[in-house]
Structure formats: C-alpha cells, structure tokens
Amino acid sequence: MAKPCLFSFSLCLLLLSSLCLAERPERYKECQLDRLNALEPDNRVESEGGVTETWNSNRPELRCAGVAFEKHTIQPQGLHLPSYTNYPQLIFIVEGEGALGISVPGCTETYEEAQQSQSSQDPRRRSSRSQSQEQEQQDSHQKIQYFREGDIIAIPPGIPYWTYNYGEQRLVAINLLDTTSLLNQLDPSPRRFYIAGNPEEEHPETQEQQGQQREQQQGAGGRRRGKHQQEQEEEGKNNVLSGFDPQFLTQAFNVDEEIINRLQNPDERLKQIVRVKRGLSIISPKSQEEEEEEEEEPRQRGQPERREERREEEKEEEEEEDEPRSRERYERQSRRRPGRQQGRQGEEQEEESESEQEGRGQQREWERTTRHRRAQGEEGEEEEEETSTRVRRQQGRGRGQEQGQEQGQEQEQEEEQQEGRRGRHGGRGRRSGQQREEEEEEQQQQQGRRKRQESRNGLEETICTARLLENIAKPSRADLYNPNAGRISSVNSLTLPILRWFQLSADYVNLYRNGIYAPHWNINANSVIFVTRGRGRVQVVNCQGNSVFNDDLRRGQLLVVPQNFVVAHQAGDEGFEFIAFKTNDLAATSPVKQVFRGIPAEVLANAFGLRLNQVSQLKYSGNQGPLVSPQSESEDHTLPKVA
C-alpha cells in the first residue's frame, strides 16, 4: 500500500514541477537577448491638440525590462485629457513647459476662487439666487504644479492627472510605464483609463490580446459580452463613463440627463489631446499675478496722449525758468560758504577741547575714589579677620572636651552609614543595570513603532503633500562633471522620496562633442535609454563577451540595456544627450576603471598577463571618473564599429 501512494505522490510532484517550469522558461527567455535593437515608435494617434506615439510592448527588449513607453507632443493651448493607469509612471519633459494637475482622493481642494462682492448687485437678484448657485460660481480644485524642460514627474498608479501647454512652443514628454510593478495587480499589458473624451486605442497590441481572449471565451455570457463590447467600440465609446447606465449616473451624480449625455457621448474630435481655443483659465498664484499686471497695463496705456504731451511741455518750461534762478542761488551760496565753514570748524574744535577736558577731570576723580575705597576695604577686612580668630580660640578652649566625645560618636555613626551605603549602592548598581536594559528594550520598541507608523501614514502625509517634480537637466544639478567631456545628474529615492514607493530612478547624461562615457554596467537595475538631442555611438556587451549592440543612436530612439550588460557611449560632433530610466529606486553603476583600481596590481598582472608598469598604467592613467575627454580633437577617437 505504501508503494502505490509514494508512486502517485511522485507523479503529482512531477506534474506540478512541469507546470511551474513551463512558465519560468518564458520569463527567462525574455532577457536571453543575443541582439539589441534601437526602437522607434510603432503606433501614432493624431489628435486636435497634439500627437501620441507608443512603442509595441511585445518587443523582446521591452518585455525583458518590464516597461512600456509613450511619447506625447502637445501643441500650444493643447490639453491632454484626464486619465490614469494601473502602474506608476515617470515622465521626462524633453521640450517646452506646461501645467500639471492631479486629483488625489481624500485630499482637500486647496485652491479656491475669491468670493465676488455683491454690494454692487441688485438686492432683488441676490435674494432670488439660491446658495447652491452661488457655490457653483466659486470653483475650487487641488494644487496645480508647473513644469519645464528637464523636469522628471512621478505619477502614482490609479491617480488621474492632466497636462496643459500654456507656452508658445510645443510640449514634448516621454512616459515610462512600469507595467511589471508590484503596484500593478493586472497583467503587464499597457492600458490607460481616460475619464473624458473619445480617445483612440494607444496600444493596439493590448486590444489584440483582449480580442484573442474573447474568442477563447465559451458560453452565451461570454458571447453576449463580446457583442456588447463590439457595439460600444463601433459607437466610439472609449472613456470609463461611457459603459454605465445613463439613469444610474444621473442618480449617482445628481445632475441632469443632458450632462450625462455629454459625458457618455463626447464629440468624435475630442481624442486624447484637445485644443482650448481661448486658453485655459485656472486658479493659480502665477496666473493671478499675470492677470493683475495685464489689467494695470491698459490703465496706464489708456491715458490720453495729449495730457502727457502737455505735462512734458509744462515740465520743460518750468525747467527753463528755474535754470537762471538756480544759478544765482548757487553763486550766492558759494560766496557765503567759506566763512560759514570756517566758523563751524572753529566751533567744533572748541566743543571738542571742552569735552576732552571734562572727560579727563572725570577720569581723575573716578581713580581717586576707587583708590580710597580699596584702602578702606582692606583695613576693614583685616580687622574682621582678627576678631573672628579671637572668638574661635575662646570657644575652642571651652568646648574642647565636649567635641572629643562627640567626634568619637560621629565617627562610629559614619562607619555604620558607609557600610549601609555600600550595600545599598551594590543593590542599586544591579537594579540600575536592569533598568538600563529595560529602557534600551523600550527605546527599541518605540523606534520600531515609529518606523511602522511612518510607513503607515495617512494620505495627508504621503500623497497629498508628496513632491512629484525634480529638475535634473540644470548644469548646477550635476552629480558628475568633466568640463571637457560632459555631466551626469541622477534622481532617485534620496532626492525624490516618492520614487521609493515606485522603485524607479533616472539618470540624465549630457556628453559634449566627442565626450566618452566609459564602459560600465548597472548593478541592480535594467536601463532604458531615450535620446533627447544629438547623436552618439553606443556599444553593449553581454555576459558571453559578445557585442549585442554597436551602432549610432539618434534623437527619438530607445535602447534597452539589461542588468549587468556592459555599455559605453561616445558623443558625435553635435553632442549626445539622453535620459536613462532605471528599474530600481537606488540604481547603482560600476565603472570598469574603478574596478581595476580596487584590485591589487599582482592580481591584475596574473589575470591579464601584464607587467607591473602596464598594470599601473591601466589603473592610474586617465581620469578617475567615468567621463573621459579625448586627447585631441584633430584625431579620430570615435568608438570602432564592429561588423
């Protein structure tokens, strides 16, 4: 009986292991890349106010990194409609400037319109208006943040946000979508939930996967759902409100049916990005100050030109009349000034001499008084000491015998007290040691409670007040700098704490002409490079020592560099700027040059078969940092291209 049970149990284990191993090879093969490719956008959606471009998330490189990408180009006065995703996002502003608004549930609306004064209005109209109508006129919303070129923006999952281009130039932003984040409870397919508008599908590969799943569904319920969804797609309903029952929404939102009809059936032209014809007026300190300045300018410009001309003519006439008078006054004053100045100088000298004499007399009197007081004090002290010694001698003669007896008793009492104190001190020492241990344990427990409380803070201390922006393109922000090669600046959970929740970070690299970013690898993260400006040569080598990428990268292209793959960059004649997104909030790199410097010379000599002088040259020649400048611009120091 035991053998059949063991046999059946082993079969079950084999089946389970085969099922598990059937899924694992697919995940492992995603990063077994023999060749990397420079990726360009695969899908393009044109809207009234801009363009949205996406990369196919089924690309092997992107599946290895577990991310997806979007690129939004918003024209002036363009509004990217409110939307949210089920995974965190990192947005880098490549060009332009704009406004960002997020709507976090549970956070207060801190921006409010000022109450309009109703003193000038008719009291009959005021009485006819209800309080609800007055509240509708006064808008309030959550904080609006302004961004510009070089900013990194962190968007939490499930939080709706919108962007608006208030500048005169186009706004270009690249979005990293961390689809494999632990915060994503759905599958890693990229998807975006639009609250408004009639947006087109940004990731067709996701729609294709959903279509295949519908075909595999069985039963009448699945067929009915598929038909219902097909009807909705034919009607063009793609926002999250279009699928609800209109009557249910009217009751839930407590609004008219006309409003619900507008929400569920938007205009076909309202896609991802719409154009605001008259501009967007929102509550913000910046816009309010600009409006006040604009209101003051027309008032000043509205003054009649004739009045200004008359005032200028009157000023010129007054100046002409005042010129001869001012000259006569100046001549008279110049004639009188020498005598007055001499008289004033004489008076000042007399006053100074008198004040000096008075001061000297006061000093002499003060010295005399102090000497007299000191002499009196010394004599009094000597007399007091003599009297006190006489009294002590007389008292000591009469009390000598009594003190001898009392001293003996006091000595015995002191010995007994000392013995008791020793015993008490020993007990206290033991007790104090125990108390210290207990206090240390309590302190450790309190620290643990504080850490738990910090990690469990409410919305008011995390999302509502979290900092979402950080500019990493400023030259003063550089973490590594070589004036002949370029600069590198990083943003991570230490500089932007919200990234600790996202488990993401980024590096901004700006290489000057022919500047070199020496070979290095990412220790604990995958890296995705997006070129923002210029052109450069990039080489990537895998664990087998094979070159998986050796080509030029230009503006607008993506390149995935897997973890621990060695990579090197060199800029062209136009320079080379790129943003490198990392899948770790504290991503670290390891330059090969620093590794050589950390290894003893004997080890390197035996490992590479070098002489000691060659090893010292390998370790200590050139720059210490990863940014290297070529020796001369006349020679060609570009990275060689391997066929």
UniProtKB/Swiss-Prot annotation:
Keywords: Allergen, Disulfide bond, Seed storage protein, Signal, Storage protein. Residues 623-632 have a biased composition (Polar residues). The keyword Kinase does not apply. SUPFAM superfamilies: RmlC-like cupins. Residues 228-237, 298-313, 324-333, 357-369, 634-643 have a biased composition (Basic and acidic residues). Residues 36-261, 470-616 form the Cupin type-1 domain. It comes from the Eukaryota. Belongs to the 11S seed storage protein (globulins) family. This is Conglutin alpha 2. The lineage of its organism: Eukaryota, Viridiplantae, Streptophyta, Embryophyta, Tracheophyta.
